[in-house]
From Swiss-Prot:
Organism superkingdom: Eukaryota
Residue stretches in coiled coil: none
Primary localisation category: membrane
Residues making up the signal peptide according to the UniProt record: none
Claim: Transcription is one of the keywords in the record: no
Record-given protein name: Ankyrin repeat domain-containing protein 46
Topology term for the membrane: Single-pass membrane protein
GO cellular component, one term: membrane
Amino acid sequence: MSYVFVNDSSQTNVPLLQACIDGDFNYSKRLLESGFDPNIRDSRGRTGLHLAAARGNVDICQLLHKFGADLLATDYQGNTALHLCGHVDTIQFLVSNGLKIDICNHQGATPLVLAKRRGVNKDVIRLLESLEEQEVKGFNRGTHSKLETMQTAESESAMESHSLLNPNLQQGEGVLSSFRTTWQEFVEDLGFWRVLLLIFVIALLSLGIAYYVSGVLPFVENQPELVH
């Protein structure tokens, strides 16, 4: 069964294209080896790759690719060879060599859309659907990853700008961090209760000094002043 479009001509005056239509691998190879252009087109802009792919001749597709055929070539309607495919192995070959499964022709149709219109084998439809789904998932993962990278870069840039605009703040944060570390080490070395006792003794000494200097006992009202 042929999977090219309606009104397709089975005859052409271009030997290489006719060999691709006929599925003649050996003749195609001889023509390519003799110097035939692997990207030569018919009157509708189709290359040998289009014609071979439409008939499921994956061996000729591989041969054309080996001799430099453009896998991304489109006909005058914007169809790639993948748009004309109706065979699993040919689709797998083209996709594995870089053709995008979700590429659209000039009418906005993807290979899957055209395959459904032509009523191709269900295995082919399932393969195309699976490949499209993988393409969408891969795009979503890539987009999410790029957004995360951009957000991280923006955050780091903002922090760097803030530090440059506030050098004193950055220096103060460094001093505070150093003091906090020193205090923690001091408490760990001396012990919590000893530190608490030391603070209590210092507080009592402070009260005693204040009383000696002012003659007034702190926190106690209406005291007579001492005469020295």
